Amino acid sequence: MLEQGLLVTAGVAFLISVALSPLFIPFLRKLKFGQSIRDEGPKSHQKKSGTPTMGGIVIYVSMMVTSLIMAIKFNHLGAEVSLLLLVTFGYGLIGFLDDYIKVVKKRNLGLTSKQKLVGQLVIAIAFFFIGKGQAFHTYIMIPGTDVKFELGWAYFVLVLFMLIGGSNAVNLTDGLDGLLSGTAAIAFGAFSIIAVAQEQFGVAIFCMAVVGAVLGFLVFNANPAEVFMGDTGSLALGGAIAAVAILLKQELLLVIIGGVFVMETLSVIIQVISFKTTGKRVFKMSPLHHHYELCGWSEWRVVVTFWSVGFLLAVLGIYIGVWM
């Protein structure tokens, strides 16, 4: 019965997202909340300048409302769901402020790095101290085994790293039409299956609400995109997926299921280190999706390829997390 409820959860979030988007997009246009495109980005992206951004609010509202209602309906509104809603709200708020400054104050970089980091730290610290001992414990497990390692206070550092790093990694992936929407749906779908296997149904409900919300948004975000989610959506999704992995004790498995996000982040790190130490670039442009664009791939080809890689990694993650 609950499995059907999870499908209903995804369906409700999808319908809310699809219903809200056509209403919200004209509103964003009216407010002139258009995306500004950086000059150093691919030249083909300049035509996207002015496309409404901050569409992540639709994802945000759809998944928050649906997960809250369905968790209450199925009596699974526990500490886990509350923590997930807290992280989603907090990181979504940071993203909203970042987007607002970009489009209203006309400051292309939004919040400063320090401002953003402080906000991310505060939410991560709150998550740890509220959830420690109640929703999660301070050990990690080796995926596919019963082996666990108690980290004590080192786990605090891991939580900070995962939430801050996860939110920024997912944010880096949001550079092509539909890329993040699709990869996020795949990753959260994989974690929902693992959550069901662990009988953590509150987490599963939340994950399926995210799946439905981002797929509904994808209808309007696929190439050519009518709207971008902005940092409002990407930071919220990044913080949420890291929190899900922590609550399911699948911290290490996140590297596999979120492999696309990891590859995007590593490409940026490698590019920066290489350029600063040798003066040469490893990639034509980073993050990685831009490299393939400059290699002559169409935007749609890059997106579908990354979706496919994300799907294969998700299947591998499910196999390790559920059946090994």
Curated annotation (Swiss-Prot):
CDD domains xrefs: GT_MraY (cd06852)
GO molecular function: metal ion binding; phospho-N-acetylmuramoyl-pentapeptide-transferase activity; UDP-N-acetylmuramoyl-L-alanyl-D-glutamyl-meso-2,6-diaminopimelyl-D-alanyl-D-alanine:undecaprenyl-phosphate transferase activity
Cellular component, GO annotation: plasma membrane
Record field: transmembrane: 5-25, 52-72, 77-97, 122-142, 149-169, 176-196, 201-221, 227-247, 253-273, 302-322
Gene Ontology process terms (BP): cell division; cell wall organization; peptidoglycan biosynthetic process; regulation of cell shape
Location in or out of the cell: Cell membrane
Record keyword Cell cycle present: yes
Subcellular location, principal: membrane
Alphabetized UniProt keyword annotations: Cell cycle, Cell division, Cell membrane, Cell shape, Cell wall biogenesis/degradation, Magnesium, Membrane, Metal-binding, Peptidoglycan synthesis, Transferase, Transmembrane, Transmembrane helix
CC cofactor: Mg(2+)
Substrates-to-products reaction catalysed: UDP-N-acetyl-alpha-D-muramoyl-L-alanyl-gamma-D-glutamyl-meso-2,6-diaminopimeloyl-D-alanyl-D-alanine + di-trans,octa-cis-undecaprenyl phosphate = di-trans,octa-cis-undecaprenyl diphospho-N-acetyl-alpha-D-muramoyl-L-alanyl-D-glutamyl-meso-2,6-diaminopimeloyl-D-alanyl-D-alanine + UMP
Biological pathway: Cell wall biogenesis; peptidoglycan biosynthesis
Enzyme Commission (EC) number: 2.7.8.13
Keyword set includes Hydrolase: no
Pfam families (alphabetical): Glycos_transf_4 (PF00953), MraY_sig1 (PF10555)
Enzyme class: transferase
Database matches in InterPro entries: Glycosyl_transferase_4 (IPR000715), PNAcMuramoyl-5peptid_Trfase (IPR003524), PNAcMuramoyl-5peptid_Trfase_CS (IPR018480)
Membrane topology term: Multi-pass membrane protein
Listed NCBIfam families: mraY
The protein's role, per its UniProt record: Catalyzes the initial step of the lipid cycle reactions in the biosynthesis of the cell wall peptidoglycan: transfers peptidoglycan precursor phospho-MurNAc-pentapeptide from UDP-MurNAc-pentapeptide onto the lipid carrier undecaprenyl phosphate, yielding undecaprenyl-pyrophosphoryl-MurNAc-pentapeptide, known as lipid I.
Family the UniProt entry places it in: Belongs to the glycosyltransferase 4 family. MraY subfamily.
Protein name in the entry: Phospho-N-acetylmuramoyl-pentapeptide-transferase
Organism of this sequence: Bacillus anthracis
